[in-house]
Structures are given as structure tokens and as C-alpha cells.
């Protein structure tokens, strides 16, 4: 508000002072049983939450606009706001009533943002809440740092500006922060990336001074307890360290304390992971279907994990496969050992049964470190620690990776015992409600509780004595939270009330009194209750203090338990779905016998729609490209996707849906499959297709797998054919990537005659009268025809349309048979003339750095170039 604080009422002055620290955040201000919002916050909340907007009184010469929500329904409203990308600051009453003049003391106790969630009610069991920080560095470089507050690991990376979109799509943050000092061009790039779909989350600016490289390095070293970042291969990531400074400052700001549970840093290099662009993740339906649903996807098929932390880890494995095979071999060896020699013979089933029901140790540990853990989470943690101790006894399984995991499952000494002794078996939801600390843990608390327990006996005894003394048979001695203890007498018996009865409350048909004896007991009992609650709160804080040294060990245990959960799940899935172990080799190849599409096969089994037709794939040094032709609905896209999914599954260390699989080095999986117009960004299907194809041609290498499906649609036949042939030739001759190239242009089947590493394949179909039967088999050679009219018939096309189409097709085929000059689509293009040495203008232009010029310098440079060009 514009008026100075001294012109406002004391309460509104307090509110505005708090709000000043959180100008871009909705402030929930606790008032009794409600959280109130005022002024612009109230108007925004009323609109977003559909709650009532009211006006009440004036402050600072203006009407106070307000809206509120009940305190007991807070989590519901927070969930809705977070899903809308909003952030919320919670201001609680921290002072005692009557302790000071003026309004009750309040302070902001936590800030809830989409990227820093820790509350169980706000988090999805199977998804992380990720905060990502960006730092614009020199030479068109960018530093990235991100973390999940509940996980406690900081990730660092650096990239060129033109690679930022790919990194944001890979990380998929829930919230992005960046320095307020970035250039306008960088900010425009971020907005363009969000519009393009590279990410979809709120962005916020933070003070420029927080993004300091030296500060970031110091903070990271403090968290690691180390003198150098060299052991984490992060010593040379200065831009990422600057991003980490902003990241940790913001995360600490939202949690209201240091992140003491952050003990791990992971530096990620662009060449460490198999590249899975956003189009690949989308087209292969890894975690979302093309319609945006969670199932059926590859993740939904794989995820039979028993814990939420296992599900989250499996998703990370799936989206971050490593190029180097050591990790995949490790996981594959472990899951194979868990499988045993045959179904039911391995230890996976026993282990999964023991893991079942385990608490989310990862998130509980983070909340312990942040002192936000709820009492009801702790008994579950005790049971999980006991489960972990039993699981650790399986360490005799003779498999190196599993032995490491079991070794980390031993609970920290004394942790479970402390919690078992200190926390009630069924504690209250909140400490302030009492009943959290177990009986017998603290003698003083037990004594205070005994006073409360004796209350019922005293009241019954007093009621008996007062009935005898007054002769009032229906006299009652009772208690409520508003009026305390009282003796209730009906109106018809008021003449019998003794002189020492003092009136406390008048009702319609009765009066309530208190006596000196009852008043003395009330003071003692209520005091005991208040003191017991204070004692419980103090004891709970002491317990959290004693748990802090166990946080690192609990974090390691959580990671081990999640890893074991995923490995057992992969073992179970491989047995249930009849998958085989892939073989990793050094020579370049993708050789699959009896490959199946895992999701399609599972859907067929669920719906009893028949069995999946397996197919072989052989790509190696001699055959790097398959040109696939055949009718629509024949299975071309399914075949191509299944090859990519098998490669991906093998790369994460899973068994694969095939009879056998040999896989060489892979650095990326690129896909160009299907499209729809991007109306929001004014891009047609054809433009999207060409954009994605261009990206693939620039990014793919000889170790990449490329899927190209029906490239060239959306323009004229000749244009599409020419482009398709050019793209296929480039992939074969220049890129030399492993390529599955499905096409409806039969002219492209001439390519293998001139390209030594390409072969024709087709999806088989057969005619039965006027109908078509799809065999879904991939066979050598080109397709003989496309069966488009038969497919149209299956789709329900009206008979007159089909009749017209058949006559037109016959005429076109007859005309084509008359013979015309055949254009050689695959003739080597004429060499482009060698580029001449750069002209003076070009040399001068190449030496200009537009980002380093002031507007005046840019104008001077332009005139200089103009003069040079005119000579």
C-alpha cells in the first residue's frame, strides 16, 4: 500500500511489514482459525481458488480487501495453488496471547514454491519437485544447478546457450530461478524455450549478487565437508558453481534454515548421457502418452516398485541412460542374480515382500534435517529401519553390486531405539495437539499427564459430594474449552444453590457456577495441560536434535533401499514379461532376435487381442540403414519404436523384450515420428517435421540410432520425395548413423542399389479377395504395393469413394507404365565450388561480437561495413 506503515492499524502494519519481504509471493497470514490474505493477494487468491472476496474496515485511508481459508483446509488450497505455479509464504502466530501490547507476534515460518516442496500432502509419491538455477556466463555459456530438496543432492552442468533447451527438457524442472542481471536477449531466449515446450514451469528472478562463483564454491565445499571439488569432477565448472550459489540461497530462503542434509554433488557432462531429445521422449512415450496420460507408457509398464522412492529412481534411470556401459552391466548383473535360475527360484520375491510397506525414508530424512517431520511419520520410519536390518541379512548373495547395497542397509546405531522409546505408537498429527511423546520417556511429562488423568476422578467425586450437599439430583460437574470447569444447575433448582457458588454462565434453562474448590483445581489442571504441551514440544525438538547426526546414514540407507527396490522390480518384470539379458559389445551394432514392443505386447495380453509378432533387427558395420516400406497400419512405426525401446532398456541395465540382443556403443536416440500442427507457435506439421529432421542431421553421429517415419509429408509429392531422398542420402553417406527410415515413397527403394550400407525391408500383408490381412512381419526387400485403398476400406470409407479411387489408381498406374525419364534421386550431387577467401567485409563482420557492443558502437560498425561494401 502507498500509505506509510504508521498510518495503518497495528495489525495491518504488521501484515504489510511481513508482505514487504515477499512481494511476489501470496502471504497467508494466520488469524485465529483462518489464514487471511489482503489487498492484491486477496483478489488473486479469490480468482484462483474461487473463494469469497470481502471488504472490512479501513487502514491507511483505504478499504481493506481480504479473503481467507480455514486453517484445517490449508493443504488443500496449497496444493491447488502450487499446481497453478504459485508460491505461498505462511505467517504463523508465534507469540503468546497477552504477552505484549499490540497484535500477536507473527513471522513467516516457511515458503512453499513449486520447486522446493517437502510436505507429504503436496508431493507426488512418484515424482520429484526440482528447483533449477541458471547463470548466464561469458562466451555464450550457461551454468546450471538443480536439486530436489527432499533428495539432498546438487547437480551441476554447463552448456552453450543453444544447448540450453535440450538440458531443460532433460531435467524437467518444477521451478526455474535466474539472476535479475541477465541480458534481455537471454531472457527472451528463456521465454522462447518455454513457448516451444522445452519446459513448462514458473520462472523467477533473484538478486544478481547471489549468483557468485566464489560464494557457490564455498557453499558446496561446506556441504561436502571438503577442501576441493576435484573429487566430484566439478572444480572447473565455474558457471555452474555460480548457479549453485543462487540455488542454495533460494532453497534456504524457502525452508527458513540451512540444508544440512545436502551432502552430495554430481557433475553432469553433456557427453556422459545418451541423448534423448524431447521429441524422442514424447514419440517413444517413455513417461507420458502422446495424449499426455501417465499410461500406457514404458514407465507405467516397468514401475512395479514397492516404494515411492523406488519409482522415482526408476524414472531417473529411464530418462538418464549412460553411454558408458559399466553402470548398465552392474545393474544387469544384479537383477540377473535376483532373478535366479528360473521363475520363483531367485530371491527377488522374498525381498520385494520385505520391502513392501516401507516408508519413504528419503523424504522423511530430508524433513528431519529441515525439522519439518510430522510425528506420524516417525513410527513408520522405525518399522522401515527394522525392515532394512532384515534386508541387510541377505548380504550373502554372491553378487558384488548387491553386496554393496546390502552393506548400506544397516540402520544407524541407536536411531530406531531412540524413536521407539520416544514416540507414541499412534501419535497425534501435530505436536501442538499433544500425545506425541511416549509414556515413560520423560518423568516430568508423565507427572503432568497424571494430573490431567486424575481430573476425571476428581470431577466425579466433586459431583457426588455437591449432589449430597445441595440435594440437587441432576447437578452436573463438567468442562469445555471455552468456559473451563463448571457446575451446572437447572433453573428449577436455583433456590437450592449454596452461597459459595459463583455464577459463570447463564443458559436458557440452566445456570453454570464455579466454587473456590473447583477454581483452584481448574488452575492446577489447566496449568498442567499447558505445561505438558510445552514440555512435549521441547522434547520433540530435542529428539530432532539427536536425529541430526543420523541424517547422512539415513540418506545412504534410503538410496540403497530405493536401488534394491528398482533392481527387484526389473528382475520381476523380466521374468513376468519373458525378457532376455542383452549382451554389450564394443563393435558398432544393434542386433535383435525376436524383438517385441514391450507396451504394445502387454496391452495385447491385457485385452486378449492376440499375440505380438516378434521381428528381427540387424544393424551393423555392413548394414547401417533399413528403408522400410509397406501399408499404413502394417506395423512400421511399432517396429521402429520397439528397436529404440530395446536399445534404451538395455542401456539402463534392464533385460529386454527379445530372444537375444547384441548392442554396441550408443550416444543418442533421435526420432522423427508423426506430428501435429503447433498452432501456438505458428508452425505447420511440415515445418515441425523439417525442424526436427534438421536437428537430427546436425546432432546425430555414427553411434546414434535414428528413426525417420514418413518424412516429406505436408508438401508437394515431388518436394517431399526430393527432401526424403536428400535426408536419407545424408544419413547414409555423411552421418552414418544406425537408421530406420520408413517411407511411403517407393522411389526411395532404389537407394540400396547405390548405397552399400542400406537395405530394403517391408512390412508384410496379404490380400484376401478385396480385403487385406496385415501380417506385421518385417521382411527383406521393398513392398510390392501400399494397399492404401484396402486400408481406407477398413476405415469405413463409403463404397462410391473406394470405387472412384480404384479407377483413378488404375489410370495413374497405366500412365506411369508408359515410361518417362527416371530422375536419379541418389546421384552424387555436384561438388559445391570451393569457397573463396573471405572478403574484407566478411572478415570485418566475422570479427564483430554483437553482444559486446553498445548501441553507439553497433551503429558505427554498421556504417564502417557500409563504406567497405561500397568500395
From Swiss-Prot:
Record bears the keyword DNA-binding: yes
A GO cellular-component term linked to this record: cytosol
GO molecular function, one term: mismatched DNA binding
Binding site for ATP: 630-637
Pfam families: MutS_I, MutS_II, MutS_III, MutS_IV, MutS_V
The keyword Translocase is annotated on this UniProt entry: no
Keywords: ATP-binding, DNA damage, DNA repair, DNA-binding, Nucleotide-binding
GO biological process annotation, one example: mismatch repair
Segments for region (Disordered): 830-849
SMART domains linked to this entry: MUTSac (SM00534), MUTSd (SM00533)
Function: This protein is involved in the repair of mismatches in DNA. It is possible that it carries out the mismatch recognition step. This protein has a weak ATPase activity.
Similarity annotation: Belongs to the DNA mismatch repair MutS family.
UniProt-recorded name of the protein: DNA mismatch repair protein MutS
Amino acid at each position: 500500500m502507498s500509505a506509510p506503515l504508521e498510518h495503518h492499524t497495528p495489525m495491518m502494519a504488521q501484515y504489510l511489514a511481513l508482505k514487504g519481504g515477499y512481494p511476489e509471493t501470496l502471504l497467508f497470514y494466520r488469524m485465529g482459525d483462518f489464514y487471511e490474505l489482503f489487498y492484491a493477494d486477496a483478489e488473486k487468491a479469490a480468482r484462483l481458488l474461487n473463494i469469497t472476496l470481502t471488504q472490512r474496515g479501513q487502514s491507511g485511508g483505504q478499504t481493506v480487501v481480504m479473503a481467507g481459508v480455514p486453517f484445517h483446509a490449508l493443504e488443500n488450497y496449497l496444493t491447488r495453488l502450487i499446481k497453478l505455479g504459485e508460491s505461498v509464504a505462511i505467517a504463523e502466530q508465534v507469540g503468546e496471547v497477552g504477552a505484549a501490547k499490540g497484535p500477536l507476534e507473527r513471522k513467516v515460518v516457511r515458503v512453499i514454491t513449486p520447486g522446493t516442496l517437502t510436505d507429504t500432502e503436496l508431493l507426488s509419491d512418484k515424482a520429484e519437485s526440482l528447483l533449477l538455477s541458471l547463470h548466464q556466463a561469458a562466451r555464450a555459456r550457461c551454468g546450471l544447478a538443480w536439486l530436489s530438496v527432499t533428495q539432498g543432492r546438487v547437480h551441476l552442468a554447463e552448456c552453450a546457450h543453444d544447448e540450453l533447451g535440450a538440458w531443460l527438457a532433460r531435467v524437467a524442472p518444477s521451478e526455474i530461478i535466474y539472476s535479475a542481471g541477465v541480458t534481455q536477449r537471454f531472457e527472451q531466449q528463456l521465454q522462447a524455450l518455454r513457448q516451444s515446450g522445452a519446459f513448462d514451469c514458473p520462472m523467477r528472478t533473484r538478486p544478481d549478487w547471489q549468483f557468485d562463483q566464489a560464494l557457490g564454491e564455498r557453499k558446496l565445499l561446506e556441504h561436502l565437508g571438503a577442501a576441493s571439488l576435484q573429487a566430484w569432477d566439478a572444480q572447473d565448472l565455474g558457471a555452474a558453481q555460480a548457479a549453485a550459489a543462487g540455488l542454495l540461497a533460494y532453497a534456504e530462503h524457502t525452508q527458513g534454515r540451512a540444508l544440512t542434509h545436502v551432502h552430495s554433488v554430481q557433475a553432469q557432462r553433456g557427453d556422459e548421457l545418451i541423448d534423448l531429445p524431447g521429441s524422442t521422449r514424447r514419440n517413444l512415450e517413455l513417461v507420458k502418452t502422446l495424449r499426455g496420460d501417465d499410461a500406457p507408457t514404458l514407465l507405467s509398464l516397468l514401475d512395479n516398485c514397492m516404494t515411492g522412492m523406488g519409482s522415482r529412481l526408476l524414472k531417473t534411470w529411464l530418462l538418464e541412460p549412460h553411454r558408458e556401459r559399466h553402470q548398465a552391466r552392474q545393474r544387469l548383473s544384479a537383477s540377473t542374480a535376483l532373478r535366479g535360475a528360473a521363475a520363483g527360484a531367485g530371491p527377488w520375491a522374498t525381498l520385494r515382500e520385505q520391502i513392501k510397506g516401507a516408508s519413504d525414508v528419503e523424504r522423511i530424512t530430508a524433513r528431519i534435517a529441515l525439522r519439518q517431520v510430522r510425528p506420524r511419520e516417525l513410527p513408520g520410519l522405525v518399522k522401515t529401519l527394522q525392515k532394512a536390518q532384515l534386508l541387510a541379512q541377505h548380504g550373502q548373495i554372491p553378487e558384488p553390486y548387491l553386496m554393496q547395497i546390502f552393506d548400506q542397509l544397516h540402520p544407524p546405531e541407536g536411531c530406531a531405539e531412540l524413536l521407539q522409546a520416544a514416540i507414541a505408537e499412534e501419535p497425534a498429527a501435530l505436536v501442538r495437539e499433544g500425545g506425541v511423546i511416549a509414556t515413560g520417556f520423560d518423568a516430568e511429562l508423565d507427572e503432568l499427564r497424571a494430573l490431567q488423568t486424575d481430573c476425571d476422578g476428581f470431577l466425579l467425586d466433586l459431583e457426588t459430594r455437591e449432589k449430597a450437599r445441595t440435594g440437587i439430583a441432576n447437578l452436573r460437574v463438567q468442562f469445555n474449552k471455552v468456559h473451563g470447569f463448571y457446575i451446572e444447575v437447572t433453573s428449577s433448582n436455583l433456590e437450592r444453590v449454596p452461597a459459595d457458588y459463583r455464577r459463570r454462565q447463564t443458559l436458557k434453562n440452566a445456570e453454570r457456577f464455579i466454587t473456590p474448590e473447583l477454581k483452584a483445581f481448574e488452575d492446577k489442571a489447566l496449568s498442567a495441560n499447558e505445561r505438558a504441551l510445552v514440555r512435549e514440544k521441547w522434547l520433540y525438538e530435542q529428539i530432532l536434535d539427536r536425529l541430526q547426526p543420523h541424517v547422512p546414514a539415513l540418506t545412504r540407507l534410503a538410496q540403497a533401499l530405493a536401488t534394491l527396490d528398482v533392481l527387484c522390480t526389473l528382475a520381476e518384470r523380466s521374468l513376468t514379461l519373458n525378457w532376455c539379458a542383452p549382451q554389450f559389445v564394443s563393435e558398432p551394432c544393434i542386433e535383435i532376435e525376436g524383438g517385441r514392443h514391450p507396451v504394445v505386447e502387454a496391452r495385447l495380453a491385457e485385452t486378449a487381442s492376440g499375440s505380438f509378432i516378434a521381428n528381427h533387427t540387424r544393424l551393423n558395420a555392413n548394414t547401417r540403414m533399413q528403408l522400410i516400406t509397406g501399408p499404413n497400419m502394417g506395423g512400421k512405426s511399432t517396429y521402429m519404436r520397439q528397436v529404440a525401446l530395446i536399445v534404451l532398456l538395455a542401456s539402463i541395465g534392464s533385460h529386454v523384450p527379445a530372444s537375444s540382443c547384441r548392442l554396441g556403443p550408443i550416444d543418442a536416440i533421435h526420432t522423427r515420428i508423426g506430428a501435429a500442427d503447433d498452432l501456438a507457435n505458428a508452425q505447420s506439421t511440415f515445418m515441425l517435421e523439417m525442424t526436427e529432421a534438421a536437428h537430427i542431421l546436425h546432432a546425430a553421429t555414427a553411434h546414434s540410432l535414428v528413426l525417420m517415419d514418413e518424412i516429406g509429408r505436408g508438401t508437394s509429392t515431388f518436394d517431399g520425395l526430393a527432401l526424403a531422398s536428400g535426408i536419407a542420402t545424408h544419413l547414409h553417406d555423411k552421418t552414418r548413423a544406425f537408421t530406420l527410415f520408413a517411407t511411403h515413397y517407393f522411389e526411395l527403394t532404389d537407394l540400396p542399389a547405390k548405397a552399400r550400407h542400406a537395405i530394403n525391408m517391408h512390412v508384410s500383408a496379404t490380400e484376401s479377395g478385396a480385403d487385406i490381412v496385415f501380417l506385421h512381419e518385417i521382411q527383406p526387400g521393398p513392398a510390392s504395393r501400399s494397399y492404401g485403398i484396402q486400408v481406407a476400406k477398413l476405415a469405413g470409407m463409403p463404397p462410391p469413394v473406394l470405387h472412384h479411387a480404384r479407377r483413378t489408381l488404375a489410370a495413374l498406374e497405366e500412365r506411369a507404365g508408359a515410361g518417362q525419364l527416371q530422375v536419379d534421386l541418389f546421384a552424387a550431387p555436384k561438388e559445391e565450388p570451393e569457397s573463396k577467401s573471405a572478403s574484407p567485409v566478411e572478415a570485418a563482420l566475422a570479427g564483430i561480437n554483437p553482444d559486446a557492443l553498445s548501441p553507439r558502437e553497433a551503429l558505427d560498425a554498421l556504417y564502417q561495413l557500409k563504406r567497405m561494401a561500397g568500395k
